[in-house]
């Protein structure tokens, strides 16, 4: 192999040494220059640490072990489940999911055995991707003593668990289940044996403390870290839950669920076995009030107005800020809104909004997808005086343009809910000019809110009805098609068919909600929908009945208490001959069910429809939906006991709850006014009969006039014996 040509001799070696000395001097100069730059002026002793890569004391080939100090992750590792444990807990999860237990006692025994097997492994299960859902189910179905034991297992680890991807859901569920138990324990006890029963199952350390203390101990573990947890993707959900629990808010309210729920697809409340419900406002111990104020102050401590306003549009921090604002304005009193350290005053510190930064901040939230939700919460709970200031300064002149926007329209709805009758009527006149544009864009939520609030406030809705009629057209059937968006289902948009198909379900839903709101208000708005139904052809009516959104409108129009008898007599015969077809359809079966109620005073129509169901009995019994319709119409009773079915069809009450012919059913006719008068008279006679004869000398005559009594037979027997 050929070698590289190298110069030999003393001259070549001298040149090589000279070049190496030059390189060494260059490196030393560079090192000295870097060291000088890193010294702090005015203090020669204080130096900034020199990076490893700029120090050559160990030679050019030196590579340090830790060139860059990585952030230290202090999250503890609780271990992993082995394969046998994972298989066991996966089977337990499937068993609870199927819920095929014979009774509640068997299910509780199974839960106890699973919890016993999970002893000492609770933290592993909570942090496991495959088994954390089992822990959520176990928490939902555990008793109070078992929940206290779980609090004991989680104690000392809440700060790390609430930040874990899977364990955070278990913490949420644990706090949600603890809320009704706190309410139950805060009530005065009447039985001394209640505590003894709870302490039987759990150990002394688990059940000795009340649930309120366990919740407060968990909150104390999170103190000092609120600023970081506020924007942590998993811990923020737990913070919202804790705020609602401390405030005693309803945990089943839809508005609260929207800002709390981590997963919409699962409903673990279905597994609850305790009798205490979390619905409605809950009573909480007084110590929760102090803990709530301390938690709110800790969450916003050190946060200035600029940071809070930036948090308003933060995807994770904004929902926490919404709960903070709602709890502060509703639970801590109206005086809290005047406190300069409150969340409201730190967001909007100005008393006047004209040409201020607060006005700019509010204007920017109207069109932000995240910030608009905070603005909804603000308008919903802010005191009346503060609301009027914002409305007059910012909203009143822009209500029309806000109603047109897809995002700002939801804020406009919250504004309409707070307006008085006079302000609502003036606002309606402004919005009416934008109705054609809103109808064209299918932005109907503001129109629906106008109808609902106008009915509540007693406003004149005739101008709105005329505007809607001109916007949708004068032809009745075409108008209904445009409202329900049924004609666009088969004709996608030529410009962007993908976008049209994506937005169509949402547009159909909003159109259905608008039509239902119009039917609930008697007058020209309801007549617009009813006249369209009467002029519609039978095939079009069947299409509406089979539509998931259109069938809701049809059901609303057939409700007995709202629909007139003339309308029901005209539209119900159109369904004759198509009842079996509707009964076998998912949406149409609900229309058939509502026909039973709609024909309460139209017995001849109800019998005609029942005969049609009998003629299609086999097809109905072979279908799940058909069997439900058959049961709701009491068709077994119709075939075997026609008289009792007629009594039920007329709206008469039956003692039996089902229409099974094997049960002995008794028909109780509604009492007429004459029967009620007779009962009152008989009650008066009995009262007078109980009084002494000295007080009521005419009692005997009134008793004889009222009704015959058994003592008369006894007096006859005494006469015979005499």
UniProtKB/Swiss-Prot annotation:
The keyword Transmembrane helix does not apply. Residues 11-20, 27-42, 684-705 have a biased composition (Basic and acidic residues). Keywords: Nucleus, Repeat, Ribosome biogenesis, rRNA processing. SMART domains: Pumilio. Its main location: nucleus. It comes from the Eukaryota. It is found in: Nucleus, Nucleolus. Pumilio repeats lie at residues 113-152, 153-188, 303-339, 357-392, 393-429, 535-573, 574-611. InterPro entries: ARM-like, ARM-type_fold, NOP9, Pumilio_RNA-bd_rpt. Gene3D superfamilies: Leucine-rich Repeat Variant. Residues 1-10 have a biased composition (Basic residues). Residues 1-54, 187-207, 684-722 are annotated as: Disordered. Pfam families: PUF_NOP9. The keyword RNA-binding does not apply. GO terms for molecular function: RNA binding. One of its GO terms (biological process) is endonucleolytic cleavage in ITS1 to separate SSU-rRNA from 5.8S rRNA and LSU-rRNA from tricistronic rRNA transcript (SSU-rRNA, 5.8S rRNA, LSU-rRNA). Belongs to the NOP9 family. RNA-binding nucleolar protein required for pre-rRNA processing. Involved in production of 18S rRNA and assembly of small ribosomal subunit. This is Nucleolar protein 9. It comes from Coccidioides posadasii (strain C735) (Valley fever fungus). The lineage of its organism: Eukaryota, Fungi, Dikarya, Ascomycota, Pezizomycotina. The gene is NOP9.
């Amino acid at each position: 192999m050929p070698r590289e040509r190298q110069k030999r001799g003393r001259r070549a070696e001298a040149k090589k040494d000279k070049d190496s000395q030059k390189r060494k001097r260059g490196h030393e100069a560079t090192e000295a220059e870097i060291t000088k730059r890193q010294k702090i002026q005015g203090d020669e002793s204080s130096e900034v640490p020199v990076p490893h890569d700029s120090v050559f004391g160990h030679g050019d080939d030196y590579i340090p072990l830790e060139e860059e100090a990585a952030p230290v992750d202090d999250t503890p590792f609780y271990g992993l489940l082995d394969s046998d444990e994972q298989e066991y807990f996966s089977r337990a999860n499937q068993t609870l999911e199927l819920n095929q237990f014979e009774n509640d006692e068997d299910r509780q025994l199974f839960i106890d055995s699973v919890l016993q097997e999970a002893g000492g492994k609770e933290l592993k299960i909570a942090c496991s991707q495959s088994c954390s859902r089992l822990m959520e189910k176990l928490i939902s179905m555990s008793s109070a003593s078992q929940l206290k034991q779980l609090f004991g297992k989680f104690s000392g680890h809440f700060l790390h668990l609430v930040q874990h991807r899977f364990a955070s859901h278990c913490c949420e569920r644990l706090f949600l289940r603890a809320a009704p138990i706190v309410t139950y324990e805060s009530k005065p006890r009447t039985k001394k044996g209640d505590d003894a029963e709870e302490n039987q199952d759990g150990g002394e350390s688990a059940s000795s403390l009340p649930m309120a203390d366990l919740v407060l101990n968990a909150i104390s573990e999170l103190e000092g870290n609120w600023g970081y947890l506020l924007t942590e993707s998993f811990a923020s959900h737990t913070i919202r839950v804790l705020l609602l629990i401390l405030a005693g808010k309803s945990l089943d309210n839809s508005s609260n669920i929207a800002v709390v729920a981590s997963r919409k697809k699962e409903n673990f409340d279905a597994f609850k076995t305790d009798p205490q419900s979390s619905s409605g406002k809950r009573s909480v111990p007084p110590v929760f009030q102090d803990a709530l104020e301390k938690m709110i102050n800790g969450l916003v401590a050190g946060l200035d107005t600029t940071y809070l306003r930036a948090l308003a549009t933060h995807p994770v921090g904004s929902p926490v800020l919404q709960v903070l604002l709602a709890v502060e304005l509703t639970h801590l009193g109206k005086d809290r809104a005047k406190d300069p350290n409150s969340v409201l005053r730190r967001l909007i510190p100005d008393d006047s909004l004209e040409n201020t930064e607060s006005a700019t901040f509010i204007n920017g939230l109207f069109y932000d997808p995240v910030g608009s939700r905070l603005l909804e919460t603000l308008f919903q709970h802010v005191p009346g005086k503060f609301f009027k200031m914002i409305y007059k300064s910012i909203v009143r002149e822009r209500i029309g343009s806000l109603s047109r926007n897809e995002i700002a329209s939801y804020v406009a709805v919250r504004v309409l809910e707070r307006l008085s009758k006079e302000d609502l009527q003036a606002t309606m006149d402004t919005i009416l000019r934008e109705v054609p544009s809103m109808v064209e864009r299918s932005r109907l939520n503001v129109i629906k809110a106008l109808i609902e609030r106008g009915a509540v406030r007693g406003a004149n809705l005739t101008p709105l009805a005329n505007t809607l009629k001109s916007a949708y057209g004068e032809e009745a059937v075409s108008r209904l098609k445009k409202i329900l968006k049924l004609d666009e289902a088969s004709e996608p948009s030529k410009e962007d068919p993908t976008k049209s198909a994506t937005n169509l379900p949402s547009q159909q839903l909003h159109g259905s909600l608008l039509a239902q709101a119009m039917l609930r208000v008697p007058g020209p708005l309801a007549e617009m929908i009813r006249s369209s139904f009467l002029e519609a052809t039978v095939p079009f009516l069947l299409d509406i009945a089979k539509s998931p959104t259109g069938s809701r409108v049809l059901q609303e129009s057939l409700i007995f208490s709202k629909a007139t008898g003339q309308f029901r007599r005209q539209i119900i015969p159109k369904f004759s001959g198509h009842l079996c077809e509707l009964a076998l359809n998912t949406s149409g079966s609900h229309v058939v069910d509502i026909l039973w109620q709609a024909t309460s005073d139209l017995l001849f129509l109800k019998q005609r429809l029942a005969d049609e169901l009998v003629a299609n009995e086999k097809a109905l019994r072979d279908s799940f939906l058909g069997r439900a319709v058959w049961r709701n119409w009491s068709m077994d009773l119709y075939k075997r006991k026609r008289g009792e079915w007629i009594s039920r069809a007329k709206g008469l009450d039956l003692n039996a709850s089902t229409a099974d012919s094997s049960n002995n059913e008794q028909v109780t006719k509604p009492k007429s006014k004459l029967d009620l008068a007779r009962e009152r008279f008989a009650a008066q006679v009995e009262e007078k009969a109980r009084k002494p004869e000295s007080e009521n000398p005419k009692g005997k005559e009134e008793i004889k006039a009222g009704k015959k009594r058994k003592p008369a037979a006894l007096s006859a027997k005494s006469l015979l014996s005499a």
